[in-house]
Design a protein with these regions (language model features):
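Mg2+-dependent endonuclease catalytic cores in nucleic-acid-processing enzymes, primarily RNase H-like
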Residues: 1-92
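Amphipathic alpha-helical interaction/assembly segments
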Residues: 93-96, 107-113
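Short, solvent-exposed helix-loop connector elements
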Residues: 90-102
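Phosphate/oxyanion-binding active-site loops and adjacent basic polyanion-contact surfaces
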Residues: 3-7, 102-108
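Active-site-proximal flexible loops/turns
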Residues: 33-34, 112-115
């Protein structure tokens, strides 16, 4: 378990090394402190609160990306494992609720990445390592 300062330092390294324009961070719970620290260090961070509606929207988008073959996962065992434990149910108000019996850190990171590249009026190219690029996009 990393502390917020260590995580912020790692994010700062990645912003520098990969020339990232914006880092999307789950602001729910402890992530709020990470957002504050990142902003203090001039890291281009944007917080996303994982409300029921927001999380449902991001996971609907991910489902559409998979269905339309816009995203592929290869050789990412932990990601596939965690995705396989996701379930959905609906609240009395009809809002979809995404749940997992296991950790969902990898899938949550994936939906944040998908949200990041599709935000705004244009798509952005993500410069990632060849291994991760091949694993995510084939």
């Amino acid at each position: 378990q990393s502390n917020v300062v260590d995580v912020c330092g790692k994010i700062n390294e990645m912003v520098r090394d990969y020339k990232l324009e914006t880092v999307f961070i789950d602001e729910t719970g402890l992530g709020g402190g990470l957002i504050d620290l990142a902003r203090e260090q001039d890291i281009p961070a944007r917080g996303v609160v994982f409300s029921l509606q927001e999380k449902a929207s991001m996971y609907k988008n991910l489902r559409l990306l998979f269905e339309n073959h816009k995203i592929t996962l290869k050789k990412v065992d932990k990601m596939v494992y965690q995705l396989s434990y996701l379930t959905r149910e609906y609240t009395e108000g009809g809002v979809m609720k995404i749940k997992s019996e296991e950790h969902d850190d990898y899938p949550d990171s994936l939906v944040l990445a998908c949200r990041a590249v599709s935000s705004g009026n244009q798509w952005h190219v993500i410069d990632v390592g060849k291994g991760l690029q091949k694993a995510l996009f084939g």
